Amino acid sequence: MNPGIILNNRVLDVVFIAWFIAQFYKVLTSIFKKGKLDITRMWDTGGMPSSHSSTVSCLVTSIAIRYGISSDLFAITIIFAGIVMYDAAGIRRAAGKQAGVINSLIEKIPLFIGKAQYNKHFSKEKEAKLKELLGHTPFEVLVGCILGIIIGLLFRKYLQG
Protein backbone atom coordinates (compact mmCIF):
# COMPACT_ATOMS: atom_id res chain seq x y z
CA MET A 1 0.00 0.00 0.00
CA ASN A 2 1.31 3.45 -0.93
CA PRO A 3 1.51 5.93 1.94
CA GLY A 4 -0.34 9.21 1.88
CA ILE A 5 1.18 12.55 0.98
CA ILE A 6 0.66 14.43 4.26
CA LEU A 7 2.72 12.67 6.94
CA ASN A 8 2.30 9.44 4.96
CA ASN A 9 -1.36 9.39 6.04
CA ARG A 10 -4.16 8.97 3.50
CA VAL A 11 -6.85 10.07 5.95
CA LEU A 12 -5.03 13.37 6.47
CA ASP A 13 -4.77 13.81 2.70
CA VAL A 14 -8.52 13.45 2.19
CA VAL A 15 -9.44 15.55 5.23
CA PHE A 16 -7.15 18.33 3.98
CA ILE A 17 -8.94 18.26 0.62
CA ALA A 18 -12.32 18.63 2.38
CA TRP A 19 -11.02 21.59 4.39
CA PHE A 20 -9.45 23.18 1.30
CA ILE A 21 -12.61 22.88 -0.81
CA ALA A 22 -14.77 24.40 1.94
CA GLN A 23 -12.39 27.32 2.44
CA PHE A 24 -11.84 27.86 -1.29
CA TYR A 25 -15.62 28.03 -1.76
CA LYS A 26 -15.61 30.97 0.67
CA VAL A 27 -13.01 32.72 -1.51
CA LEU A 28 -15.14 32.15 -4.62
CA THR A 29 -18.31 33.45 -2.96
CA SER A 30 -16.46 36.58 -1.84
CA ILE A 31 -15.91 37.38 -5.53
CA PHE A 32 -19.65 37.26 -6.18
CA LYS A 33 -20.64 39.08 -2.99
CA LYS A 34 -18.00 41.83 -2.98
CA GLY A 35 -17.08 41.89 -6.66
CA LYS A 36 -13.42 41.31 -5.82
CA LEU A 37 -11.12 38.52 -4.78
CA ASP A 38 -10.70 38.28 -1.00
CA ILE A 39 -7.98 35.68 -0.45
CA THR A 40 -8.13 36.26 3.34
CA ARG A 41 -11.36 34.21 3.35
CA MET A 42 -9.12 31.19 2.78
CA TRP A 43 -8.01 31.39 6.43
CA ASP A 44 -11.07 33.06 7.90
CA THR A 45 -13.67 31.49 10.18
CA GLY A 46 -17.43 31.56 9.75
CA GLY A 47 -19.56 31.62 6.64
CA MET A 48 -20.79 29.09 4.12
CA PRO A 49 -19.94 26.24 4.27
CA SER A 50 -18.52 25.38 7.66
CA SER A 51 -14.99 24.12 7.05
CA HIS A 52 -14.93 22.81 10.62
CA SER A 53 -17.93 20.62 9.79
CA SER A 54 -16.56 19.53 6.43
CA THR A 55 -13.24 18.62 8.04
CA VAL A 56 -14.62 16.57 10.92
CA SER A 57 -17.35 14.88 8.88
CA CYS A 58 -14.74 13.92 6.27
CA LEU A 59 -12.57 12.58 9.11
CA VAL A 60 -15.47 10.45 10.38
CA THR A 61 -16.25 9.20 6.87
CA SER A 62 -12.59 8.43 6.14
CA ILE A 63 -12.16 6.53 9.40
CA ALA A 64 -15.38 4.59 8.73
CA ILE A 65 -14.11 3.60 5.28
CA ARG A 66 -10.60 2.75 6.41
CA TYR A 67 -11.25 1.07 9.79
CA GLY A 68 -15.01 0.35 9.93
CA ILE A 69 -17.83 1.74 12.02
CA SER A 70 -17.20 -0.71 14.86
CA SER A 71 -13.65 0.59 15.43
CA ASP A 72 -12.64 2.66 18.42
CA LEU A 73 -11.30 5.32 16.05
CA PHE A 74 -14.75 5.72 14.50
CA ALA A 75 -16.33 6.13 17.94
CA ILE A 76 -13.78 8.77 18.91
CA THR A 77 -14.12 10.72 15.66
CA ILE A 78 -17.91 10.75 15.64
CA ILE A 79 -18.00 12.12 19.20
CA PHE A 80 -15.33 14.67 18.28
CA ALA A 81 -17.31 15.70 15.18
CA GLY A 82 -20.47 16.18 17.21
CA ILE A 83 -18.69 18.45 19.66
CA VAL A 84 -17.04 20.51 16.90
CA MET A 85 -20.27 20.98 14.94
CA TYR A 86 -22.26 21.84 18.06
CA ASP A 87 -19.61 24.39 18.98
CA ALA A 88 -19.58 25.90 15.47
CA ALA A 89 -23.36 26.41 15.36
CA GLY A 90 -23.86 27.20 19.02
CA ILE A 91 -21.12 28.69 21.13
CA ARG A 92 -18.99 30.29 18.40
CA ARG A 93 -22.08 31.70 16.66
CA ALA A 94 -23.28 33.24 19.93
CA ALA A 95 -19.82 34.75 20.51
CA GLY A 96 -20.00 36.32 17.04
CA LYS A 97 -23.40 37.84 17.80
CA GLN A 98 -22.08 39.23 21.09
CA ALA A 99 -19.10 40.75 19.27
CA GLY A 100 -21.54 42.50 16.93
CA VAL A 101 -23.45 44.00 19.86
CA ILE A 102 -20.23 45.14 21.55
CA ASN A 103 -18.96 46.73 18.32
CA SER A 104 -22.28 48.55 17.92
CA LEU A 105 -22.13 49.85 21.49
CA ILE A 106 -18.54 51.05 21.04
CA GLU A 107 -19.57 52.98 17.91
CA LYS A 108 -22.29 54.77 19.93
CA ILE A 109 -20.04 55.88 22.79
CA PRO A 110 -19.19 59.23 21.10
CA LEU A 111 -22.90 60.12 21.12
CA PHE A 112 -22.92 59.94 24.90
CA ILE A 113 -19.56 61.40 25.92
CA GLY A 114 -18.73 63.55 22.90
CA LYS A 115 -16.36 62.85 20.04
CA ALA A 116 -13.40 64.74 21.54
CA GLN A 117 -13.58 62.82 24.82
CA TYR A 118 -14.00 59.56 22.93
CA ASN A 119 -10.95 60.18 20.75
CA LYS A 120 -8.95 61.22 23.81
CA HIS A 121 -9.72 58.09 25.81
CA PHE A 122 -10.79 55.36 23.40
CA SER A 123 -8.83 55.80 20.16
CA LYS A 124 -6.97 52.48 20.49
CA GLU A 125 -10.14 50.53 21.28
CA LYS A 126 -11.85 52.14 18.29
CA GLU A 127 -9.28 50.58 15.94
CA ALA A 128 -9.64 47.10 17.40
CA LYS A 129 -13.13 45.95 16.37
CA LEU A 130 -14.08 42.51 17.55
CA LYS A 131 -14.42 39.85 14.88
CA GLU A 132 -18.10 39.08 14.31
CA LEU A 133 -17.98 36.24 11.79
CA LEU A 134 -16.95 33.43 14.15
CA GLY A 135 -19.54 30.70 14.00
CA HIS A 136 -22.09 29.26 11.64
CA THR A 137 -25.81 28.94 11.14
CA PRO A 138 -27.12 25.40 11.49
CA PHE A 139 -27.55 25.34 7.69
CA GLU A 140 -23.88 26.25 7.12
CA VAL A 141 -22.89 23.42 9.49
CA LEU A 142 -25.19 21.00 7.66
CA VAL A 143 -23.78 21.96 4.24
CA GLY A 144 -20.22 21.57 5.58
CA CYS A 145 -21.11 18.18 7.01
CA ILE A 146 -22.60 16.98 3.72
CA LEU A 147 -19.58 18.31 1.81
CA GLY A 148 -17.19 16.40 4.10
CA ILE A 149 -19.12 13.15 3.73
CA ILE A 150 -19.19 13.51 -0.07
CA ILE A 151 -15.44 14.20 -0.24
CA GLY A 152 -14.73 11.17 1.95
CA LEU A 153 -16.91 8.96 -0.23
CA LEU A 154 -15.35 10.31 -3.44
CA PHE A 155 -11.91 9.27 -2.16
CA ARG A 156 -13.08 5.85 -0.96
CA LYS A 157 -10.77 3.87 -3.25
CA TYR A 158 -7.81 6.05 -2.26
CA LEU A 159 -8.55 5.47 1.43
CA GLN A 160 -8.89 1.73 0.95
CA GLY A 161 -5.75 1.49 -1.20
Task: Cite the ranges covered by each PLM segment.
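Helix-loop-helix hairpins and the membrane-proximal interhelical loops
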Residues: 1-24, 32-35
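Membrane-embedded catalytic cores of phosphoryl/pyrophosphoryl-handling enzymes
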Residues: 23-25, 39-161
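Hydrophobic residues in alpha-helical segments
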Residues: 31-32, 64
